[in-house]
Amino acid sequence: MQEEAKRYAVVTGANKGIGYGICKKLASSGVMVLLTARNEERGLKAIERLKKEFDLSDFVIFHQLDVDDPASVATLVSFIKTMFGKLDILVNNAAVTGGKLLNGDALLRKRNGEEIDSKEVGYETYDLGEKCLKTNFYGVERVTEALVPLLKLSSSPTIVNISSRAGLLKNISNEWARTVFSDIDNLTKEKIDDVLKDYEKDYKEGSLDIKGWPTFASAYTMSKAALNAYTRIMAKKYPHFHINSVCPGFVKTDMNHNTGNLSIDEGVETPVMLALLLNDGPSGCFFTKGEVIPF
């Protein structure tokens, strides 16, 4: 590959699961991939596996990243400046569930429409929910804002936000929040913050149900709804970027006790397709199974 044609990617939360699968696919496509993970030991093990099992030594390197830590993000930015001088692709994958899954089979049955008590599936707490918003939304925002200057140096800057159908507007039961997130012409990051602050306040007070917020996978749903809103804002702000949200589907990962119906390789197909977009691709969209669906 000619040096001037080389493309550079960052994937967050990539030591396993979907993030790891995206790294493997991008590196196999000739992209130089910076695999990041909060846990350095696990991240280095992932890199060694990619090198030994898939012969990708020339296309993968590791850097530690905690998306919740501004200092960690700043260190990553400095590293990319020194090593690459620019960035072409950012895949925001790092995420947590906002709860503790206790029974994968019960989760599967609930997803399939059975009347299952949520307590049988697992439990959610305010502290776990707060952490979920911090990582899944504010972590993405922090990393993205820090890397935009390097993405601007690319001829085809691309951001892929790994989201979920859970965050679609039809699943946001609070009418005010749904209205705010739907009003793309007037949507701002400050308005997203206002919604999340109201949500956190009601969560802390134990009034999610009476205030009309989601009560199952509550913080996860709200974090992904906020992420989708952020995708749309950023796509408007940077019209020469490709910025999209994508639901990889119900993929077998640790997050769902491997109850998903898709393999990692199947789940990463659409995220990788979006990551490799060149000049004429879509932006400001929500993708799943290779197709655009309404937010």
Predicted features along the sequence, with ranges:
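C-terminal helical subdomain
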Residues: 142, 225, 245-253, 257-295
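Canonical Rossmann dinucleotide-binding motif of NAD(H)/NADP(H)-dependent dehydrogenases/reductases
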Residues: 2-37
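N-terminal Rossmann-like NAD(P) cofactor-binding module of classical short-chain dehydrogenase/reductase
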Residues: 10, 34, 88-91, 160
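Hydrophobic positions on the long internal alpha-helix
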Residues: 91, 139, 143-147, 151, ...
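Hydrophobic structural elements of the Rossmann-like NAD(P)H-binding subdomain
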Residues: 91, 160, 243-246, 256
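Catalytic loop of short-chain dehydrogenase/reductase
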Residues: 96-133, 152-236, 247
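The beta1-alpha1 cofactor-binding region of Rossmann-like NAD(H)/NADP(H)-dependent oxidoreductases
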Residues: 40-41, 64-78, 126, 137-140
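Hydrophobic/aromatic anchor residues within beta-strands of the central parallel beta-sheet
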Residues: 60-62, 243
